[in-house]
């Protein structure tokens, strides 16, 4: 059974940015887009780059290692339509951000 785990507080992630967090033994990339929070696997499927450290453009993140781009609302790769990273459900509890793992 999956549980929601607190990974950050709202004020820790500015709009248009991301952050690497840990939950349930997994590294997760957490993003803020217009006050909405999204969570995907932190690992780029291309060569394992840290997505949470990438540049954010709209609802996309660019892997800092080799430039692969993902829509963090769906996990879908912009570069390869057959490729997707895992997405995690996010909910807010006051100012706490929780991710389901």
State the predicted function of each range.
Residues 14-101:
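Rieske [2Fe-2S] iron-sulfur-binding domain
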Residues 4-10:
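Short amphipathic
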Residues 1-3, 14:
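A boundary/linker detector
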